Regions:
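Extended, charge-enriched "interface" segments that sit outside catalytic cores
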Residues: 2-80
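Glycine-rich phosphate-binding loops that contact phosphosugars or nucleotide phosphates
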Residues: 77-237
């Protein structure tokens, strides 16, 4: 059986599924699916654009986020100078997946913050971070696209009360929120004096948000080269 030959010398053997897969690839090529996707052509899915064109922001987010690199790097430098050593991300699903991936790939870089991700309501895990992290040296990242995720808001209430008992009226300075414009979390951030509220583009789904603020804020705290990361993502696109 002959191998399928793709671009850049790629070859693949698909066994008994080869004919079906080759036919599907040919159909994708004939219908210009890739080029239409990058043009955000909603007719790839449905004849009407509702709930499609406003979910394709991930296609060009690597280019769009380049202008925010300096801001994120300056914020990280400021946090390090203030003595922050740990970062605890409070989030579920798409809001936590990219940070977890970045941490596993790059690890905790010396001289930057150690990143921890709390994406479980297991009482033992919540208590572990409550007991092991010093609130004076910990930055809490509250990450939810909708600003209504019950688990994340429960984490926020728990850890805010914990930090407030230890630090007092300036507890909000230990918190950063990442959310969509207009979400309830924006009001929370203003009310409780959060250090910063990052507003991510609303046309990106949670699981496609790796190169938005949801992924890049934690990446900056880890000391990852954001310019290089976004450059490589842009090339890949």
């Amino acid at each position: 059986m002959e191998a399928w030959k793709g671009g850049k010398g790629m070859e693949a053997f698909w066994g008994r599924y080869q004919k079906e897969i080759e036919l599907s690839l040919l159909t994708l090529e004939e219908e210009k699916v890739i080029s239409r996707l990058w043009k955000k052509d909603h007719t790839l899915w449905k004849p009407y654009p509702q709930e499609i064109v406003d979910r394709l922001g991930w296609l060009n987010i690597p280019q769009e986020m380049q202008k925010n690199v300096a801001q994120l790097e300056n914020m990280t430098d400021e946090l390090i100078k203030e003595g922050f050593q740990e970062a605890l991300l409070l989030g579920m699903g798409g809001s936590s997946l990219a940070p977890q991936l970045f941490q596993k790939i790059w690890g905790n870089k010396e001289g930057f913050l150690n990143l921890h991700v709390l994406d479980s309501t297991d009482p033992e895990m919540v208590n572990h971070y409550a007991q092991s992290l010093d609130p004076h040296k910990t930055l809490y990242l509250v990450s939810t696209k909708s600003g209504r995720t019950l688990e994340t808001l429960s984490f926020l209430k728990f850890f805010y009360n914990l930090v407030q008992k230890k630090i007092g009226e300036k507890a909000g300075r230990q918190f950063i929120a990442i959310t969509d414009p207009g979400s309830p979390l924006v009001r929370w951030g203003e009310q409780y004096g959060f250090r910063k509220v990052f507003l991510s583009p609303p046309d990106i789904g949670g699981r496609y948000s790796a190169f938005s603020f949801f992924g890049l804020v934690p990446a900056a705290l880890l000391g990852i080269d954001l310019s290089l990361l976004l450059e490589k993502a842009t090339i890949a696109s």
